[in-house]
Amino acid sequence: MVLAPLLLGLLLLPALWSGGTAEKWEETELDQLFSGPLPGRLPVNHRPFSAPHSSRDQLPPPQTGRSHPAHTAAPQVTSTASKLLPPVAFNHTIGHIVLSEHKNVKFNCSINIPNTYQETAGISWWKDGKELLGAHHSITQFYPDEEGVSIIALFSIASVQRSDNGSYFCKMKVNNREIVSDPIYVEVQGLPYFIKQPESVNVTRNTAFNLTCQAVGPPEPVNIFWVQNSSRVNEKPERSPSVLTVPGLTETAVFSCEAHNDKGLTVSKGVHINIKVIPSPPTEVHILNSTAHSILVSWVPGFDGYSPLQNCSIQVKEADRLSNGSVMVFNTSASPHLYEIQQLQALANYSIAVSCRNEIGWSAVSPWILASTTEGAPSVAPLNITVFLNESNNILDIRWTKPPIKRQDGELVGYRISHVWESAGTYKELSEEVSQNGSWAQIPVQIHNATCTVRIAAITKGGIGPFSEPVNIIIPEHSKVDYAPSSTPAPGNTDSMFIILGCFCGFILIGLILCISLALRRRVQETKFGGAFSEEDSQLVVNYRAKKSFCRRAIELTLQSLGVSEELQNKLEDVVIDRNLLVLGKVLGEGEFGSVMEGNLKQEDGTSQKVAVKTMKLDNFSQREIEEFLSEAACMKDFNHPNVIRLLGVCIELSSQGIPKPMVILPFMKYGDLHTFLLYSRLNTGPKYIHLQTLLKFMMDIAQGMEYLSNRNFLHRDLAARNCMLRDDMTVCVADFGLSKKIYSGDYYRQGRIAKMPVKWIAIESLADRVYTSKSDVWAFGVTMWEITTRGMTPYPGVQNHEMYDYLLHGHRLKQPEDCLDELYDIMYSCWSADPLDRPTFSVLRLQLEKLSESLPDAQDKESIIYINTQLLESCEGIANGPSLTGLDMNIDPDSIIASCTPGAAVSVVTAEVHENNLREERYILNGGNEEWEDVSSTPFAAVTPEKDGVLPEDRLTKNGVSWSHHSTLPLGSPSPDELLFVDDSLEDSEVLM
């Protein structure tokens, strides 16, 4: 022990002898720079040096004011002495940090450098072998004292993400030697994260297919459950990644997967597995252009049946009654959606329809449309052309036969005669046009002792047809010439006189038949009325025509002819409109029992109003059906609200069997029903973007209309988007009161007989005992809001009508649509309370929607709107369907934070502080130095009592500031809410300090 200092002194003696002055300067400079105690014994007024992180940071510069005459010798002393200085190393780090996403974390590394070291660079931070640049993550603090300087580099990460996982460590250079700290492993844990979700596919019926789902932690492992139509497919979980093999489906289904780990569960998006079917028939078949022998047709393909269209066929048949009904079929590719039909007859009528096919089969044909070809030039020349010379008049007589009617391709307007005269040294070509009235012409002789060549062509408005074969005749100087032979003899027509005579006799026979039939009809009329009126009496008859009748008795007789009740007659007697004032147009839409037609209603001032006419489709309708049809009109008679469709009148006409048939006249709605409008905006070839403010306005319009009806004690009982109409100004009107009822006593109506009802819009109590109240309409209004938000989607996809009651009874409700605000979903969800008394009134709903609309910004373009897709209730990250989490929490007194900076410290003291705001927190594991800190004490849960709605506070989940209950969102077979674990969803900060 005594020899060691002596040997060390002998080794240092040469260096001290040669560089004593420089060494003294070095010690003086360091004493001045790092004067004061170490952090373990810092004075009260001591303040450390702080500097942001930089890979080029140097130690603080020495203080000025002292001279150092031996400055030039310092490098030699340092270079010689550095080989004998003790090694410098970083203190032990925390080692391993485990925390949840979105928390704040801080950690550090520290080092003690004696005054004997002079060439020291700053501390740099590295992650996974790459240097972290930038000064916003770390701060370096210096603590100088008499013996040296202690350096602490702090590193912080705000709201950690999974990308922050990795190994962090410090680096610095001391006397050109690189020193590396122990690594600090940061592990960010959270709910499972999907890296591959199931994808929607279109499959053939009863054909197997696969779905893949893959999610990762940490923490691992991640288990996968598959869900089909809200029911689990596999009872035992599968390790991620998981591949589900479905043997085959017969109907459309919705699949999703649940990823579970120790932090909770995450639910993937639901994907639709569609069954391929035959396509729908094409629509909007139009004629783009037509010529004499071709027609250009276009169409819009129908729904492809979840399989690409392969080709289409155009079916063409003649529309003339005399045609044989044969159909010509032209096949073409599915795209482009147009085809030119050729080889058609000119000036003919055709019926055209289109059908398309996919891999499953052919669609039904589209509705037949009528098309016509235009007039064309004749396709053949006139026949039987003869030419002879009339020598007395010095003219040529030319005769011919008209082309066949089917080959004329139009209406003949005349003929063009071309005659060429040739003689020795003379050539003359002339042409003349004659009318179509005759089939002969005369032309003067132009040249004698010459040859004349004659050709004739027929003319229509479509053009000039081909010329006939030439007919030559020789014109002598003074001699008689017989007529030239026929140029184009008609086959089978050797004698045209017989044909003309036959046609003449036929016309005479037809005329005789018409005369006889008229005489017989007149005789029958005279026999029918007999001699009731003599010629003298008939002069005393006054003929008049009533312009309009206001006789109440006449109206009663008209309504009585329908056989309806007297009460209904009294309700409708003042709204019956004369049939002559109504002009019907095209059919706008058809249902199972009726149709809606476009019409024009003449007003008293001579103008006309465009209206919609609702008729009964069937001719063999029963008396009860007529009563129900007119009862709907009676319901609307007294309505006067801008958001409720009003009745314009009732009209009666005779059906094809001579039976009176009622028609209800309503205002014309330009945009049709709301459901079709929303559906086309989402599924059309060019989707129309609808602002959220517009959707809210639709809901407010319906709420105002239903508020008006409920205040008048009317139950609609069939409120849905399909029964709401859109006016020209985009105002929604509540319509279709076929199931409406007036409540005269009490506040409910019980349905007596069984009728067709919209099951997916009916409240749960109405499904159970067929009792309807205004709160039943509130339930349907919530479903209608869901339809509007999803832009026309069908409620409860994958759930059959006969399953609806059990589905609702187990607490299931419509899920929150994508891009739906939480506040909006709150409003619609309140409409589906199991207890009707807990549902809001339409007045409250209107006020809530108006308040929500006022809080939203003005409508913007689609590109500038950002939607935040919140998680669905069933997949909320606050629910964990797995084993209980281990109650290991790091809960250390913040006053015990100690920075161990003394160079002689044998063990680095590691302390951690975790700020907790939630009693239910996940586990933290922190390893520091040679000690492992574990606080196994868990905070007990406070006693809770049910709230006023019977739901315990722990059964509620706060998401985006809104409280949700699990009772109405858990799938069938799930554990009770008391068995569910709540995964931490807070954003409280947590920091770990060395």
Swiss-Prot record:
Positions bearing Phosphotyrosine: Y744, Y748, Y749, Y867
Active-site feature positions: D718
UniProt KW keywords: ATP-binding, Cell membrane, Disulfide bond, Glycoprotein, Immunoglobulin domain, Kinase, Membrane, Nucleotide-binding, Phosphoprotein, Proto-oncogene, Receptor, Repeat, Signal, Transferase, Transmembrane, Transmembrane helix, Tyrosine-protein kinase
Compartments where located: Cell membrane
Residue numbers of Phosphoserine PTMs: S538
Cysteine disulfide partners in this protein: C109-C170, C213-C257
Pfam family for this entry, one: ig
Membrane topology of the entry: Single-pass type I membrane protein
Protein modification: Autophosphorylated on Tyr-744, Tyr-748 and Tyr-749 in the activation loop allowing full activity. Autophosphorylated on Tyr-867 leading to recruitment of downstream partners of the signaling cascade such as PLCG2.
Residue span(s) of domain Fibronectin type-III: 281-376, 381-478
Binding site for ATP: L588, G589, E590, G591, E592, F593, G594, S595, V596, K610
Family listed: Belongs to the protein kinase superfamily. Tyr protein kinase family. AXL/UFO subfamily.
Name of this chain's protein: Tyrosine-protein kinase Mer
Annotated organism of origin: Mus musculus
Upper classification of the organism: Eukaryota, Metazoa, Chordata, Craniata, Vertebrata
Gene: Mertk
